[in-house]
Every structure is written in C-alpha cells, then in structure tokens.
Amino acid sequence: MPKKKVLLVLLLLPLVSALLLSLPFLVEGVWFIALIALLPLLAAEEIATRRGIKGFWAIYYLAFLIWNLLTTWWVYLATPPGAIAAFTINALQMSLVFGLFRRMRRLTGGFLPYLFLIITWLAWEHCYFNWHVSWPWLVLGNSFATSLSIIQWYEYTGVLGGSLWVLLTNALLFRIIKMKCNGERVALSALSAALVILLPIVASLLIDASLKREIEQEGESGPRAVFAIIQPNIDPYSDKFGGMSQSAQTTQLLQLSAEALDNMPTLGDSSTIVLSPETFLSPDGSRNSLLLEYAPLENSSFRRIYDFATNRGVDYIVGGVTYSIDETAAKRNTHNTAAMIFREGAIEYYHKSKLVIMAESTPFVGIFKPLEKFAIDLGGSVGSFTTQKERSIFSTSNGVKIGTAICYESVYGDFYREYILKGANVMSIITNDGWWGNTPGHRQHLHYASLRAIETRRAIARCANTGISAFIDKSGRIVAASEWWKPQYLNGSLPLEERLTFFVTNGDVIGRVALFLFWLLLIMGVVRALTRGKLSPQGKE
C-alpha cells in the first residue's frame, strides 16, 4: 500500500473509533458498539507498528480528543475554561495509556501487551476517580448507563466492571482478527470471546429477573420514605443568580411544595421528605442574603422554608450556598450545601465534597486563577468552596436514613457508596443541570444515577432544578420522571433497604487490583528491557 494511503488509513481508523466510543453515550440502546469501539484504533496501531511509523502518539491524542468533544461538548456552555481543561487533559491521559501500551509492544509480543493495556486503563480510571483534578465522565463502564438489564452485576464490580468488559472484549476480538489474517485457527479464541461477551449478559438477566420479582412482591409494603420532589425550573443564567429575587424564587418553591403536599396520598407512618434542588438558596451580594450555618434563621428565605417545614410537619432538604466559621484558621468557609430541616425544628448540613473544577474549585491556583472570571458564579465564591472529610447522612424520627449526593458527586461510584457505609437506607440526589441546556449532558447525568442505584441497591429520589427529576428503583430503572424545563413536582415513595452489596462493602476491587498489577507489569517490563538492552536514548520515540 502506498505511504499516502497508509497515512490516510492511520488517520481515519482512530476517527472511526472516536465515533464508535461516542455513540453509546449519545444514543440509547446501542451498548454493543462499545464492545467493538476500540478495534479500529487497535488496527491502526498494528499498522503503525508493522510499518515502523513514529509519532503515532499524536494520532491517539486526536482520537481521544474527538471522543471527548463529541460526547461532552456541552460542558463548554457552563464553564469554558473547565471544558477546555477537561477535554485536553482527559485526552492527554487516555493517549498516554495507549502510549505505554505501544511501548510495551516493543518490549514483548503476544497477548501480554494487550493485557497490559487493559490493566493500565483500569488503573488509570481508578486513580482518576480519586485525583483532585478529575473528570471521569467518560469511564468506559458508563457506556452501558442506558442498558441496565445487561449490567445488574455492577452491584459486585462497580462501573469499572463495565470498563473491564469493554477492554477485554475488544482485545479478544482484535486477537481473533489478527489470528485470522495470519491463517491461524481461531475456534478456541472465538469461544473465549463469546463467553466473555455472553456470560455477563446472562448473569445480569438472571439477577434482573430476580430483582423484578422482589420489587413486585415488596409493592407498597414494608418501611418506606415518602417524597415530594420539587422542580422549580428557575433559569440558572437569566433568573437564578440575579434576574429573579431570592424571595420570588422561594415563593415559587413553597407554592409547588404546598401543592405537592396537598396532593400527597397518606401512607401510614411513613416519613415525608420534601426535596429541593442544589444551590436553591444563593446570596445576591447583600449580607442579609447570606445563609450562615451558625445563624440560619437570619436568612429570610431559609426562615420561610423552615416555618413551612415545621408547620406542615415534614422534613425538608434544601440546597444552598452556606457559610461557616473555621475557628482553627479564623476564616469563613463557603460550601455548596444540602440543609435538612427536620419536622421537629432541628437543622443539619452536608457539604458537597466532589467539586466542579473551575466553578467550585480552582486547582493549581498560580496557573488557573486568572481563568476564574470565565467560570460560573454560584454566589460570589467562584473556585473557593470548602468540602467535608467524610460523608454524612440525615436520620429522621421515622427511621429514614437518607444520603444526599450533590450534583457531580453522583458520578463517583466509590465515593457515593460511602453514604451507604454511613447507614443510608435510601438516597437522594440534588442538582442543577440547567447550566448545560437541553443537551446530552443532563440526560447522561440522570442515567449515571441509575448506575449508582445498581451498585448500592438503594432507591433514589433525584431533584433537578430544571429537570430531569426522577424516582429510580434499586434496579436502576426510572419509575417516574419530570419533564425538562418545566416547573412541577413528583410525589412518590421508595423502600428502605438495609442490605449491603459486595461493591458497597469492598469498593472498587477491580481498580485496586489493576493498580497493583500495573506496577508489577511495569517493573517486569523495565527489568526485561534492561536485560535485553532495549532501553536506550536511540530507542525513544
């Protein structure tokens, strides 16, 4: 093949992979594409290796950058600097993983380099969830977020089980293609690939069938929490932070809350919890608009919600920007907070602890501080929110122990399970997805909540300012949902669960094992290269 055609093929194949990787995130029901999405990229790498083409890392980077752009372009609408950082850094890390794989192929042959690729990618995903600067939206296991019946085993593996499935299937299929091209027998390899593809599906369908029977038998019996989810639908750009007074927003919220409670069916002794969205209460620049945790009732809007909750005899979770005093550092901290107003009058707070980069947290301040002026202002505290060290939950007098994940926190499975370890028997998520407009962003965020329900087997009440609010059962299915960009409420009840899944108890086992194996294989590879004299300045690409 002429060199120009080779270069064209080397450019087109990675672009095909970028498109295939994007489709499961953008189109519901095409999960199977993820199982072949890496084949064009692996084929391009094989051609580049055989032709001795240098600088192939740039092609990796282009492919992963396009994948990030196609799938998460909508982030730019909310935070341009954060989006640029997410796109470029994500693509850089992904391409570095494949660069290490390419280096390993120079050191050894057979299937070992592909095993190294699988392990390295899983180790990277595991670490990425825990780094201060992270954007794990495109974890490969998230490809199946709209195809829940085939991933019910996430309660054992977490989302990295899906990533392992994608990587292993692609590697095995590519091995079969190579063997076929070399005239080798592929029957045994084909059987192995078929088992890797089919066994997880069969196992999931069996778990799913059992869960459906369990949910049907439970019905409305057993201990439950009753929810009124309030979706005020306040435009985050034109109204939320300046165009509409906080008093007017609170009036709208309480009117919907009253309507929801007036139409709430009575369910025995079940606790009723009213759920409102993230950062509903936000300062407008005046001191009286500040929500001080040590004197919350001085805030007139919070006082109105407090009076509503105690007079109506309900527990009320409201999102807001709050302020606390750090006595050790003699300074005031700003938090993205879920405040629980108990029917008896007590107040507790939970502070969001996975922050959105460049909107709520500014990494490497010396470099990125000037970019804060381009970020979202959630009430005069761009890039300076304070977190809390451990998860905490709210326990009502009726036995409901509810965890409240705030927005971005629901993307982190290993983090999210900590609510259940603290005793949560039901979960809530409060968010404001209106920043992204009517794009794939808010729908992807909703579907990721389903993954958390599967991993923890905790039903979820999800409240989004502009939608989509929803009730999600423990199998991850959305049993009721609001419309997008419409003020409304949802009434419903969710069962209280006490069982701990394997994933909740043990966490991301796959990621931890992959990280250990990565270092082990890396050391083995370096030792092997040194003994063969293959590591030299001339050998570098």
Roles of regions detected by a PLM:
Residues 75-81, 127-159, 331-408, 413:
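Active-site catalytic loop in hydrolytic enzyme cores
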Residues 25-42, 67, 231-232, 268-292, ...:
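Short, conserved active-site loops that position catalytic residues or coordinate cofactors/metal ions
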Residues 90-93, 118-119, 273, 279-281, ...:
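CN hydrolase (nitrilase-like) catalytic-core segments centered on the catalytic cysteine
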Residues 76-77, 283-284, 325-327, 435-438:
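Short, solvent-exposed loop/turn segments at secondary-structure junctions
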Residues 3-5, 196-267, 432-445, 450-457, ...:
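Non-cytosolic juxtamembrane linkers/loops
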Residues 536-541:
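Cytoplasmic C-terminal tails of single-pass
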Residues 2-212, 438, 449-453, 463-464, ...:
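Membrane-embedded alpha-helical bundles of multi-pass enzymes
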Residues 205-358, 393-398, 404, 408:
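Soluble catalytic regions of membrane-associated enzymes that act on cell-envelope
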